[in-house]
Amino acid sequence: MQRTVLEVNHVFRDFKQGRVHAVQDLSFSIASGEILAIVGINGAGKTTTVKMCSTLLTPTSGSIRINGYDTVVHAEKARHGVGLVLGGDKGFYARSSVSANMRFFADVAGVSYHNQRSQIAQLLDRVGLGDKAKDKVYTLSRGQRQRLHVARALLGDPQLLLLDEPTVGLDPDAALQMRDLIRKTAAQNIGILLTSHSMQEVEELADRILIINSGKICVQGILSDIYHYAHISAVSTFSLPPSKSFEQLDICTWFADEARVLCRAAGTRWKFTVLWRKPQEQPKRRIYEIFREHVEESERAEQSDRSGLKSFEGEGSQSHSLFPSDIENRPMTLEDAFLAIAQDPTELS
């Protein structure tokens, strides 16, 4: 039976004597065995939220409860129920062995001496480091150190695990191993709070998703809830070479209220993603129509020597260099929904 391991109720967190509002009116919960992912642009408040849930920071107002214990009123009891994985190369005694590091942190976590050996061996096996117990920490790969961070955080049998960007900087194989470890950890009935910039990772792992921007919740729910909130009916992509006639921001505004258009540099070209707000039976044709309208209008205004563009006869018929030739339609992804909800309309990263 699932039970609530984390409750965040109307939490605010201010910095610089109240001049900076890092988190504003945040409320959510996590059940045992559930993975909740928090996503947002840099500075959205993700890491601040994780630190408050770990008791490293206290809320300016509101309350956070871990296993029913308030993180301010009963900080020590609340802290005992949570494991924090910040990751990175720091946090261990690099020239000591893996097992020596684990024994040290077992003492910190309050694991009794009689239980330390068995719990350490069990955790190292769980994270795939059972054969590395005698190795010095500095000899471990980055992915192995990240898994060691998870083993350390699980000392003392916490019911809640906090993972802040657990796969950042890892190669693809190490990232896959970490994701598999996260799934197996949740299967042990441990609630997990995850932050990540990888939308693919969030799609694969999260039971529920919470999108925040400027410290405020935009939307939370299962993947279909996020898609519904984004109000995207279809997605199209195309690219163009740099143009002396138009800036990329000009092109983004051509679609008005029909779509939100995002652009980024892709080598020597501009890559555009069109998030259609209104249903389109023929999105490719509509893109050509929009381009024809604005390009012809600009050329008329500049009194171009050309007599105009060839009439539109169908998709792919335009030969003008300002017309996209690689338009593709594809299914919506979480990244599309996230950008539609929380990202600046001119940036795609």
State the predicted function of each range.
Residues 1-8, 12-25, 75:
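A short, flexible loop at the N-terminus of ABC-type nucleotide-binding domains that lies
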Residues 103, 107, 114-132:
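Conserved ABC ATPase "signature" region
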Residues 136-140:
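Conserved ABC ATPase signature
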Residues 157:
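Conserved catalytic motifs of ABC-family nucleotide-binding domains
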Residues 179-280:
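ABC transporter nucleotide-binding domain
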Residues 234-349:
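Short, charged/small-residue-rich alpha-helical element at the C-terminal edge
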